[in-house]
Amino acid sequence: MARRRLSAPDQPPVVRALLGTYEFLASLQFAVVLIALLAVVLGLGTFVESGFGTEAVKFGVWNTWWFTLLNALLAVSIFCAAAIRYPWQRHQTGFVITHIGLLVLLAGCLMSQRGGIDAQIPLLEGERGSRAYEDSHHFRIDLAPKGGGAADVVGPIEFRSGPFNWSEYGTTRSWFPWALAPRDTGVIHDADGVRLEVLDFFADSTAAIAPSVKLRLGTDDFGAGSGGRMWIPIDLAWEPDPLRATEVRHRRQAGGGTVVFWKTGSTAEAEAFLAGVPDPAVGYGAKGQLVLVDDGRVHRMLVDDVLGKEPFAPAGTADAAPLFVEVHDYQPRLSGVRLRVRRGRDGPPEEMVVLADLPEVTIHAPRTGVYGTLWIEREVADAAERMQGKAGSRIDVVQAKGLPAAVTADRTPAGYTLLYRRWQAPTAAAGALPIDGRPVPAFAMPRAQLELRVDRFLPADRLDVVTLPLPFDKDKAPSAKRRAARVRLTVDGRAEEFWLAGLPIQPIEEPPGPTERRVVEAPTRSAALTLLPDAVDVGFDVQLDNFERRLDPGTSQASHFSSIVEFRGKDGRPLVGDPVTITMNAPVDFSDPATGRSYRLFQESFMGPWLPGDDLYERFTREAKDKPERLEASVLTVNYDPGRGVKYAGSGLIVIGIFTMFYMKAYFFAPRRREAEPQAA
């Protein structure tokens, strides 16, 4: 469609520049380059979604400023291409209709991007809800004055985090320019004495107890017929009071013995741990060999020889302040001895209880500076009994801190180390346990020599919950991910740095736990910080009447799951006549009569099942009178697209315009022929 040029050499420079820009934006060359660039981006977005999932492509492509800019430039190009030809001729009608349709379509896409809802509603059977949770999160700060009074709420504080752990940007995923997508790092709020900084973020995480160790016991050469490799994973966590614990998490039997983990209370105890091994030359007798470590001096004695005797000074004790020992009780059922130790014959006594099989609960004498161990050699009939642990073989692993480099140079940046002590009668050995995964000898078995390796070490001075990252999983539902952010919260000059877990998306709202709500105490007020999922109220209730899940035969993989739901108003009145069924590949459309909005509901996934005894089962059924045999939750996706009708209208105009250009032009918009002039008389 030929058109005359608007810019001319005789025009003022500013006018000529504006008209030249106008002509460039309306040119076919600019449109072709822009469309080709968008085609490349759309193709790249397809690969990104295939490799990293919908959440990642929304973050890295569809919702970015540069993709919005490309679409805006396309809209400007379309508008200028049509406007520059004004006034339009009749034969340009199809061209104009097509361009109007393209602009309407782009406007509908913008409405969908800015005002659409794509969120999840988790529901238990018999429950109903109207809150749909999105993939994004926000912070909230509750400020409470000391001494009572009304609390102030700061937030929601927007937080754009992205779909990956922040440590992964620029490394494993460097082939795609994720940095062009905005993330809220650093200071995201600073007002009225409250400052919030985000230092790190995990898109998915798990919680682990600290101090704890994750070990492997086994070998790469187990013998013929076993594939050569055999490794047993062992997860152990320190238990402050193991005798009263409801769950044994600090010891486990494996490989013909027991592996025990605990935390030493001092450098002296850690050094005594290494020194307190028995000497086979002394023997063990019937009641075992007692080893006492006294300020670096090691005293070994048979319980049979010293039980019930008057207080005595072991050979090699210090001359200035000799150690006196009195072993006055032996308990065969506990495999332990009771003794008193003192400095000098008339010094104050300190009671000790030394247990052979429970060294983690042994009562030492730290005031006197004495630490003890007891070693009992048990006879077993054969290798089978040894494999069952009847020989009492054991590996003790302890966390220590502050040991000199001469003892071990293998330590964390904070100075924590791991020590181990192996007991397999009649010998024992002790040393530093490498935290980098290098093996140390473990139990000697009939077919192989086992080794012990450290896969993970989480040190801590006191019992704590540590946040650990999980690898990216594009197929994992957003509702199943545990988000976590490392933040620094400053209130009136008081700053604390910690990991904060996001509140989980679950069918029942519960108060946040200790890892999900952190409080900073300032002189005159306190600030409680939470990380909440963004939620929208869809305006009506969805009630789950029944959830059905079928498995593939012989597997635990779900082959089909569906939900039977009802739509109800806020007053409980049904909005549709009968319940509807939502299946995996058959969404349901629902128009809210109150707002006129049209929603589409998909069966996305499910949660559970949870059985009696599970933590979530007990929490969800705490108030229920009749508890079900099991609990399952259905996760429905609610989709609202405000631009759907606009996009349909734009697509319709494009079809009409193309039809007009190619099929109606010759009939309705052909140039009129001049009527033949009458012949002269």
Listing of model-derived features with the role each one plays in the protein:
Residues 2-5, 9, 50, 54, ...:
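Membrane-embedded alpha-helical bundles that constitute the cytochrome b-like, heme-associated redox core
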Residues 3-15, 625-626:
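Short, membrane-interfacial amphipathic segments enriched in basic
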Residues 11-25, 83:
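Cytosolic juxtamembrane amphipathic/interface segments immediately preceding
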Residues 30-90:
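Membrane-embedded alpha-helical segments of integral membrane proteins
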Residues 32, 57-70, 96-107, 580-607:
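Amphipathic alpha-helical packing elements
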Residues 63-138, 632-635, 639-673:
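Internal alpha-helical transmembrane segments
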Residues 121-635, 639:
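Soluble non-transmembrane domains of integral membrane proteins
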Residues 671-681:
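Cytoplasmic C-terminal tails of single-pass
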